Each structure stands twice: as C-alpha cells, then as structure tokens.
Design a protein with these regions (language model features):
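Conserved beta-strand-loop-alpha-helix hinge in the C-terminal portion
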Residues: 1-10
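Non-catalytic connector elements of ABC transporters
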Residues: 13-124
Length: 124
C-alpha cells in the first residue's frame, strides 16, 4: 500500500509515526516514541524526514523487556489466538498472537515491549 487509507482498507493495520534518524545496513532507523527501531528502508528514505510504518497485528509480538515499551490495555483469549491492545506512548497498537499456548500471556496493566522484524512493517 502507498497510503494509510489503502493500508487500512485492505485489512486491519497499526500506524506508528516516526522520524528517520539514520540509514544503516539497508535499514532505516526511526525514532518512535522514546526509542529507536529498525525498519526495512523504503525507497528514497531520507534522514530527517517523517515516516509512518504500517504494522499488521499478526506481525508484532510482545516480550518482557525491550526498547519499544508498551502497556497492555486489552488481553482477550479467543481460543486459537490471543488479542492484545497496547499503548505505545499515546498510540494504540493492536496485536494478534496466533500461538498463545507457546507464549507468555500478558494481562491488562502490565508493562512489556512491542517487537517486530525490520522487514515485518511497510514504510509510508
């Protein structure tokens, strides 16, 4: 997708806004909230420019510790999967864990960290 409208239209998506602070090893380093994350560099990505990353709920995970701190505001077991809503700064992010029996289940109010692979997001 080349816009937030299209990305949201073709399925559920999270949008995180950040500024490119570096380009290294084929990745862009974006300042998101209070930390920096690596993403696959978009074509013509430029240091100093603002970007939005599109993160699908199934492309993210939660870990006990990490750079991108978040707070769980919804944790809902759905049988075959676990739905989460977390706050990253002031941004609500929705996640789906399709293999919850092999992962820790986070409860509402817990602090943890959002994680994703650099190539697991799309940069707008």
């Amino acid at each position: 997708p080349n816009s937030e409208f299209v990305a949201d239209f073709i399925g559920e998506a999270n949008f995180l806004k950040g500024k490119c602070v570096a380009l290294e090893d084929g990745c862009g380093v974006l300042q998101l909230a209070d930390t920096q994350v690596r993403v696959a560099a978009a074509e013509n990505m430029t240091v100093g420019e603002d970007y939005t990353i599109v993160l699908r709920p199934e492309s993210a995970g939660l870990v006990p510790e990490g750079n991108l701190k978040c707070r769980v505001v919804l944790s809902c077991f759905m049988g075959a999967y676990q739905n989460y809503h977390v706050m990253v700064g002031d941004t609500l992010v929705k996640l789906t864990d399709y293999n919850p029996k092999n992962h820790r289940i986070y409860q509402v109010g817990e602090t943890c960290a959002l994680t994703f692979e650099p190539d697991g997001v799309h940069v707008l």
